[in-house]
Amino acid sequence: MSKRDYYEVLGVGRDASEREIKKAYKRLAMKFHPDRNPGDKAAEASFKEAKEAYEILTDTDKKAAYDQFGHAGVDPNRGGGYGGGQGDFGDIFGDVFGDIFGGGRRGGQRQAARGSDLRYNLELSLEEAVKGLTKELRIPTLATCDLCDGSGAKKGTSASTCTTCHGQGQVQMRQGFFTVQQPCPTCHGRGKIIKDPCSKCHGDGRVEKSKTLSVKIPAGVDTGDRIRLAGEGEAGEFGAPPGDLYVQVSVREHAIFVRDGNNLYCEVPISFSKAALGGEIEVPTLDGKVSLKIPAETQTGRMFRLRGKGVKSVRSHAVGDLLCKVVMETPVNLNDRQKELLREFEATLTGESKKHSPKAEGFFDGVKKFFQDLNS
């Protein structure tokens, strides 16, 4: 008899998350569990089928092999697919003997799992990142069920001792000449069975819920920084500790400033006359406009440093600088009078290029020499 597709068994799509797979399995396990269906062979078969599907689809390597090769990829009796290559021996023996010998434990119940860590991607403006602020974040998570207080059992009831392992969480099995232990297949190592599950969480002890957190973002954070909020992740299983929440920061590009560490860069346009004669211009900073003195004969591309006008370091008391690059703009949309004045000005420079434009004169002298050498 051919096996059913594992995704079909659990009633989930192929793009289902691990949480969705786990939720589907728990629903089926509750429905077909042998303790709830004594003597029902069909229910027992359905329970085993769901358990097998769950174990494959929650194991990263086995799931990848199954997705690629189907059942052949996870069948240890066939070559190719999963287990057919030269994998890591530590992983292979850990997978095989971990189940046989109880995962290295000397008996005892499986400990309830700690809650999963969560990640929240937070995008900030440059101003928010530089100055810091408090953000209200809405986090979807798994929270402890308030109806059963996380026990998973119906209110007024409690989990009962597993009749298969008698509360030990482990069972002994004969393997050739050896007697070995493995997690109890009935209670999955917990030692207890929930016969009357909570109507709200359906025996999981946790429910999907959104919570709002006020998170203080320190001044000076940058793209790639991560803020850890201990205990704000998903609730743990049956009273186990919760996971943590990690807020991953990214900073949007700014229309004026470019950030490099604690320094800021910007380009400031200046007129031809201002560059030649000098004067004062207004430049933007994150704290408002400031005056910058431009000396006469300033060339385009010159960099001016405004100390302490950058970003305060999030890890020290150091403060970066603002570096302003002045870029001379060529005047446009000139009227006839303005064009005439420029021609008059140009005429006054004739024969004095070395005096007024030494770089240009040197450049053209170099070009002239290049062609002379080329033709000699």
From Swiss-Prot:
CDD domains recorded: DnaJ, DnaJ_C, DnaJ_zf
Compartment(s) where it occurs, according to its Swiss-Prot or TrEMBL record: Cytoplasm
CXXCXGXG motif repeats: 145-152, 162-169, 184-191, 198-205
Keywords on record: Chaperone, Cytoplasm, DNA replication, Metal-binding, Repeat, Stress response, Zinc, Zinc-finger
MF term (GO), any: unfolded protein binding
Cofactor note: Binds 2 Zn(2+) ions per monomer.
Zinc finger (CR-type): 132-210
Subunit and partners: Homodimer.
SUPFAM superfamilies xrefs: Chaperone J-domain (SSF46565), DnaJ/Hsp40 cysteine-rich domain (SSF57938), HSP40/DnaJ peptide-binding domain (SSF49493)
Residues that coordinate or bind Zn(2+) 1: C145, C148, C198, C201
InterPro entries: DnaJ, DnaJ_C, DnaJ_domain, DnaJ_domain_CS, HSP40/DnaJ_pept-bd, HSP_DnaJ_Cys-rich_dom, HSP_DnaJ_Cys-rich_dom_sf, J_dom_sf
GO biological process, one term: response to heat
Entry note about domains: The J domain is necessary and sufficient to stimulate DnaK ATPase activity. Zinc center 1 plays an important role in the autonomous, DnaK-independent chaperone activity of DnaJ. Zinc center 2 is essential for interaction with DnaK and for DnaJ activity.
Cofactor dependency: Zn(2+)
PANTHER family: CHAPERONE PROTEIN DNAJ, DNAJ HOMOLOG 1, MITOCHONDRIAL-RELATED
The protein, known as: Chaperone protein DnaJ
Ranges annotated as spanning the membrane: none
PROSITE patterns xrefs: DNAJ_1, DNAJ_2, ZF_CR
Major localization listed first in the record, in broad terms: cytoplasm
Family per record: Belongs to the DnaJ family.
Binding-site residues, Zn(2+) 2: C162, C165, C184, C187
Role played: Participates actively in the response to hyperosmotic and heat shock by preventing the aggregation of stress-denatured proteins and by disaggregating proteins, also in an autonomous, DnaK-independent fashion. Unfolded proteins bind initially to DnaJ; upon interaction with the DnaJ-bound protein, DnaK hydrolyzes its bound ATP, resulting in the formation of a stable complex. GrpE releases ADP from DnaK; ATP binding to DnaK triggers the release of the substrate protein, thus completing the reaction cycle.
Disulfide bonds: none
Domain J: 5-70
Superkingdom of source: Bacteria
Biological source species: Shewanella sp. (strain W3-18-1)
Entry's Gene Ontology cellular component terms: cytoplasm
